[in-house]
Amino acid sequence: MLIDFIKMHGLGNDFVVFDARKGPSLALSGSQAAAIADRRTGVGCDQLIVLEPSTVADAFMRIYNPDGSESGACGNATRCVADLLHRDGIAAPCMETVAGLLLAEINGNGICIDMGQPGLGWRDVPLAREMDTLFLPLEAPGLKMPAACSMGNPHATFFVADLAELDIPVTGPLLERHPLFPERANIGHAQMLSRSHIRLRVWERGAGLTLACGTGACATLVNAVRRGLAEREAVVELDGGQLLIHWREQDGHVLMTGPAATVFHGRIALESITG
């Protein structure tokens, strides 16, 4: 059986999107998702997205990491899905995830997603025990005392003087799986270029070092503001490009604005890849 998919990306953070809103349902196992995400023997992606019908939104987004685990949120994928829905004739797409509803606005600056309010408490992240999320007792070579929050998924942000001095492929997997994070964590590495310009690299939970991480950019601005390092609106520069992040003061919602692109449409014989 051939299944249609769309290959999309947001700042190089790439996705395989299956649209099962109107056709047959698509229930993937973790091993199937991992096989599709494999860049050598599958289609290849940072995350796999299955769109399902929703009773409260235009679509339900099920998000798989390349290791087959599920994620509660992905900012870049949400922009891609919003673009897809917008091209289907939906003016202001609304996406449902396990972390809640996400609203989109398409304008001349790109696709703006209301990512909702960050979770700032230790249970929100979550952490293994009660502590101040602004300064975690966590260290690695060149890294110490990150701030943590949740953007629908757990994030820890280290603020550093020079990103070039870090060995993220070595420290990233160790920090991601640190016992302090019972659900693992996305590990951000942020260099403050100014109060309105942040350079960021993210080791993503279940995906590794990616070209861009939308929720990571949101979490980094939130943590930078909490530390008194940034204004409430800033450009976050990732390896794949820039996002504009605004932590709105009146309601505490985080707004993320950036691009999305469709690369190609394809068909996959699921049984031939996953055996």
From Swiss-Prot:
Q: Which UniProt keywords apply?
A: Amino-acid biosynthesis, Cytoplasm, Isomerase, Lysine biosynthesis
Q: Which GO terms describe its biological process?
A: lysine biosynthetic process via diaminopimelate
Write down the EC number.
5.1.1.7
| One Pfam assignment | DAP_epimerase
Tell me which InterPro entries the record gives. DAP_epimerase_AS, DAP_epimerase_DapF
First-listed, main subcellular location of the protein, grouped into a coarse class: cytoplasm
The annotated active site, in chain numbering, is C74, C213
In chain numbering, the residues marked as site (Could be important to modulate the pK values of the two catalytic cysteine residues) are H155, E204
Its pathway is: Amino-acid biosynthesis; L-lysine biosynthesis via DAP pathway; DL-2,6-diaminopimelate from LL-2,6-diaminopimelate: step 1/1
The GO cellular component terms are: cytosol
Q: Which domain of life is it from?
A: Bacteria
Q: Where in the cell is it found?
A: Cytoplasm
Catalysed reaction(s)? (2S,6S)-2,6-diaminopimelate = meso-2,6-diaminopimelate
One MF term in the entry's GO annotations: diaminopimelate epimerase activity
The residues that hold substrate are N13, Q47, N65, G75, N76, N153, N186, E204, R205, G214, T215
Subunit description: Homodimer.
Q: Which NCBIfam families match?
A: DapF
Please report which protein family the annotation says this sequence is part of. Belongs to the diaminopimelate epimerase family.
Q: What the protein does?
A: Catalyzes the stereoinversion of LL-2,6-diaminopimelate (L,L-DAP) to meso-diaminopimelate (meso-DAP), a precursor of L-lysine and an essential component of the bacterial peptidoglycan.
Kindly provide the name given to this protein in its UniProt entry.
Answer: Diaminopimelate epimerase
Originating species: Granulibacter bethesdensis (strain ATCC BAA-1260 / CGDNIH1)
